[in-house]
């Protein structure tokens, strides 16, 4: 059997993925037949439903069901391979407990907060929703209603939700679960470059000489990209891999420079590298003088806790966290001077020779470097700073915005970029990097949306963690969540999340496909369509927008989130939700429904149903009588075209395997800000960071500051949470795939063997993990894929029977408002020795 190197890499990646899950795999499958006339299968492309990598898969349907999937060999991202989760995509929609009817808590035929769930009609569901929304709006105004969305929304679902809440209901209290995963990356980009999202693309992998992973276990969280990294590392002798984490994991198996550091000291290591670059003469002076300016960021900014928390009261600049003052290069050099190799080694616990080897990767003038990071950086009380500090290193050396030189923030959800960030479903954002606090930005949105001036509120809405607090405090009273499971994924759930959901004055709606922990805590459950049961679009980590057609029908009465949002908008007239002074500016809108104003506005409804490609179903087209997905997308695209966020025409995406924006004159952009690649960069300039008016990026002077909570005598261990290869987020989909559940049925407490011995535990012992906020029971694992150092334990959060977020702290980055799930203090108590 003769294989090319690429064929071997593909086969090897498949074998690794299957072996990791304990699954058998055929030795050879070269006789695979996919022709529809032979198999009676219809094959169509779709992006994978899981992570932010954006793999494309081919989906087989027969008799109205998805029956198989395989990697799309025409896709640039994954080149025909999938990870183990991707291989089981065909099973995620068919769990035995799929939700198919709206369910309301009832007693004696009426809604009762303490009642049992009983099936009702969609008409009844929207009746009680409208009643609750209208009552709250009348009594307390737009601040009393809110929505929690998702980086798993399709582009048009997020856009419709954004429009409904910010323009229709005039509430900025809409935020996505991407607040928990990508908000620090967003603010890092915005502060350093004035624009969001990576400048590079996955093609950097094959062009670089060095990979540095900062708080990223790509081997399990982005395994298809890791297969490309592995291929590059094993194909070229000069290529090096450095991995930094607070515990050892599978990505360390490829590391030339492995580094386990003490929590929070990544800030020290980053500043040390900048200092090394300066002191060794490795600064790219010409690049820095032409393209960079320097600033000193506010310090002592707090920890995003409640205002009455002692740590918040103590912080000097909690209300000025996102401010800075200009400095020059010399001042920056003086600032990082104390971050010596000796200090970095002493405080981080990483051997000095490894730190120096890491710094030399960045400093070597002819060596290209790609820095990858995910939640280790972002879920951090100084996550924005960490993002800024890695950009400092690439900017000082000029190793940025060109093939093989890239600081690259990887996303965790399939459309955290495409929907949460680009569409602007955060409580402070509007599409294409616009923000609600800027009057010109609000004016732009109001003109595109054809609503009166002053419709969009200036005040930033409640962010994700704040939403939970405001529900608990009774400020937020009606709350709708879609495509998220915050009762399992949110921090400090017993003290700060559950109380607000069960507050008798509040009404909580959950739209989902399965009875998740969140659904079970709600008052009303709406059954949703998922993945290829609807037409959709996702945007991945390399700015690639990908479309798919609806391929099958949703079961029972389940409806897409888009249908739910748009249909619900018919329940409100402008007279009910807009003040008289606003209606006076647009009397022609008086008495119209929000559906008519927002979705039948002559723009969203301008594409007829006949524009839908022949042979495809589209339940929303059938329901509303026009091609609503196309209308929403083209209206949304108007925000970015001509402003560096250009999207291609709608129909182009159904033909392509995705396009990376900005797309200008039909051509996608692989590297932003670099002449010859980016059409927005002026000829002769070389590089322009055009997010700022002066077209320069900012290098920030930012110090080390300690975490919000650290181990002590009563709680002597660090706790870090995260994911495993076989499960995705809270396991609501993957736990219903028998093969994946069998491979990893339970979350365990990964612990160093010496810590276990000191506590008189052994592998398999049942323990209690206790923090100041809550506790869980789980079994100890002292072997296997994750190897914490002494003093740290790691617990995944996929297991609904072991809610580790009962234990976590709701501290957030004060700039991004993103939660730090990687650092809190716990103790371990023996329950059963085993």
UniProtKB/Swiss-Prot annotation:
Which positions does UniProt annotate for [4Fe-4S] cluster binding? 48, 51, 55, 83
Q: Which GO terms describe its biological process?
A: cellular respiration; Mo-molybdopterin cofactor biosynthetic process; nitrate assimilation
The similarity annotation says: Belongs to the prokaryotic molybdopterin-containing oxidoreductase family. NasA/NapA/NarB subfamily.
* Domain 4Fe-4S Mo/W bis-MGD-type positions: 41-97
On subunit structure and binding partners, the annotation says: Component of the periplasmic nitrate reductase NapAB complex composed of NapA and NapB.
Q: Which GO terms describe its molecular function?
A: 4 iron, 4 sulfur cluster binding; electron transfer activity; iron ion binding; molybdenum ion binding; molybdopterin cofactor binding; nitrate reductase (cytochrome) activity
Source organism of the structure = Pseudomonas paraeruginosa (strain DSM 24068 / PA7)
Give the matching PANTHER family: PERIPLASMIC NITRATE REDUCTASE, RESPIRATORY NITRATE REDUCTASE
Q: Which reaction does it catalyse?
A: 2 Fe(II)-[cytochrome] + nitrate + 2 H(+) = 2 Fe(III)-[cytochrome] + nitrite + H2O
Q: Which HAMAP family match?
A: Nitrate_reduct_NapA (MF_01630)
Query: Could you say which cofactors this protein requires?
Result: [4Fe-4S] cluster; Mo-bis(molybdopterin guanine dinucleotide)
The protein depicted here goes by the name Periplasmic nitrate reductase
